[in-house]
Amino acid sequence: MERVAKFLKEAETYYLATVEGDQPRVRPFGTAHIFEGKLYIQTGKVKDVSKQIHANSKVEICAFKNGKWLRVAGELVEDDRREARQSMLDAYPSLQNMYSADDGNTEVFYFKNATATFSSFTHEPEVVKF
């Protein structure tokens, strides 16, 4: 999982896919943080992506850097603890201009039942489960 988080941070931007009814939705994200041994992402409760995750927790992310790409498929679980939100904000200080741990909007999720696949055109895919 550390390798997954490192790749996502180095890529800086990854794309999170959710579903809304029968329509796929994809948008750029930038947060990837390990807290208590789990891979977390962050969003705001007022965003459509939050509503989509709550309706269907199965998501997939994809990132690309230096000719290699990473896909992570799994379920997102909300962690409503203040310390989880604060840990994310501490890891990404620039978010503190828009979010705070106690604003009622900041929301963090961790991956469970996740399968990460590292791929390139020159190597066989490598799969990591967490």
Functional labels for PLM-detected ranges:
Residues 1-2, 43-47, 93-94:
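Charged, amphipathic alpha-helical segments
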Residues 6-20, 59-61:
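A short, Trp-centered hydrophobic/proline-enriched beta-strand micro-motif
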Residues 29-32, 74-76:
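Hydrophobic/aromatic beta-strand elements that line small-molecule binding cavities or substrate pockets
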Residues 32-66:
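A short mixed-secondary-structure module that forms the rim of ligand-binding clefts
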Residues 71-130:
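Charged, gly/pro-rich active-site loop segments
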